[in-house]
Amino acid sequence: MDLRRWFPTLYTQSKDSPVRSRDATLYLLRCVFLMGVRKPPAKFFVAYVLWSFALNFCSTFYQPIGFLTGYISHLSEFSPGEFLTSLQVAFNAWSCSTKVLIVWALVKRFDEANNLLDEMDRRITDPGERLQIHRAVSLSNRIFFFFMAVYMVYATNTFLSAIFIGRPPYQNYYPFLDWRSSTLHLALQAGLEYFAMAGACFQDVCVDCYPVNFVLVLRAHMSIFAERLRRLGTYPYESQEQKYERLVQCIQDHKVILRFVDCLRPVISGTIFVQFLVVGLVLGFTLINIVLFANLGSAIAALSFMAAVLLETTPFCILCNYLTEDCYKLADALFQSNWIDEEKRYQKTLMYFLQKLQQPITFMAMNVFPISVGTNISVTKFSFSVFTLVKQMNISEKLAKSEMEE
């Protein structure tokens, strides 16, 4: 099978190929379309609406309700391990549904961001610069498929381990289905739960990976922009007016970068904030399940779930730290350009521009948390607090004892 033919943007194009930064989100936006949150195409209007209803009803709306209803109606029938397996996913399912609704409301901003990437592309002329963008595009798409693989491995592992022991993966509540009554009901409920969870994982990939896809290609443009700033004033045959025009063009380039960031900021702020709220709790329940209750199959599924949860915030938080460093490099590059012997107008404009470049690009989670590695570590450490609390209160022993008595 020729993957290059079917997935060309997974591979780095030659430096002579035209630049298309928007290809960094090619597969992401195709999957966003399959989430059913786009305007239905005229040709497949009915099919798209039906698909959108089925996926979002099962994964976005009913699944969080099904978890809660299942706890209310059948809590006494859960073993401690089964309850924690279900609970860790329930919190993540509730957060996933919230993130999907945020992206659904703001999905047009992805198209606006891609239009701004097209503006940045028009400034790319050098073959070396084109190659740099091509590398960012291929890396971005490979990361998207890596996310998809990790999330889907979790959903499938949980499904298979549950079927092996003869129970539905999460024991959600479905009207008219009692999986204890017959093998047919068990198969139907397990299939429904797997469809809902696979759909939720598919949605989660899109709402978790889009910041990484967009910021990766932004960093490539910022690296090229830094070299453009460093070369200011070094062209010997330019007049003073031409040098000034080149500086003004760089200021315009920086404004496009800021518009790109401002375009994505509301979406990123909402989705990352939601994830920060639940990541510590979810990881804490997962640790308790792995250490105290899980059998081998459940432990493998829980470990893959933990990897998926860590992917939801960690890569983007790392990129945010790198993005801050990139901004400081822009200021250094401008200061290193040949400006000392230029005219007063050029120097004043450059100094004003330098002050703007020294203001780093940062993302905030609903103006509450700065999105950074430090914040990610802080919220992740909360999982150890949850684990320690459960250990000190001997909750695990009490749960195990109650299960033995039953």
Swiss-Prot record:
Transmembrane segments: 45-65, 87-107, 143-163, 182-202, 272-292, 299-319, 360-380
Segments in the Cytoplasmic topological domain: 1-44, 108-142, 203-271, 320-359
Top-rank lineage group of the source organism: Eukaryota
Topological domains annotated Extracellular: 66-86, 164-181, 293-298, 381-406
Annotated membrane topology: Multi-pass membrane protein
Any one Gene Ontology molecular-function term assigned to this protein's record: odorant binding
Residue positions with a glycan: 394
Principal place of residence: membrane
Pfam families: 7tm_6 (PF02949)
InterPro entries tied to this protein: 7tm6_olfct_rcpt
GO biological process: one example: signal transduction
Subcellular location: Cell membrane
Annotated GO CC locations: cation channel complex; dendrite membrane; plasma membrane
Keywords linked to the UniProt accession: Cell membrane, Glycoprotein, Membrane, Olfaction, Receptor, Sensory transduction, Transducer, Transmembrane, Transmembrane helix
Physiological role: Odorant receptor which mediates acceptance or avoidance behavior, depending on its substrates. The odorant receptor repertoire encodes a large collection of odor stimuli that vary widely in identity, intensity, and duration. May form a complex with Orco to form odorant-sensing units, providing sensitive and prolonged odorant signaling and calcium permeability. Involved in the behavioral responses to butanol, ethyl acetate, propyl acetate, and pentyl acetate. Also responds to pyrazines.
Subunit structure: Interacts with Orco. Complexes exist early in the endomembrane system in olfactory sensory neurons (OSNs), coupling these complexes to the conserved ciliary trafficking pathway.
Other observations noted: The atypical heteromeric and topological design of the odorant receptors appears to be an insect-specific solution for odor recognition, making the OR/Orco complex an attractive target for the development of highly selective insect repellents to disrupt olfactory-mediated host-seeking behaviors of insect disease vectors. Odor-evoked OR currents are independent of known G-protein-coupled second messenger pathways.
Family membership: Belongs to the insect chemoreceptor superfamily. Heteromeric odorant receptor channel (TC 1.A.69) family. Or2a subfamily.
Name assigned to this protein: Odorant receptor 42a
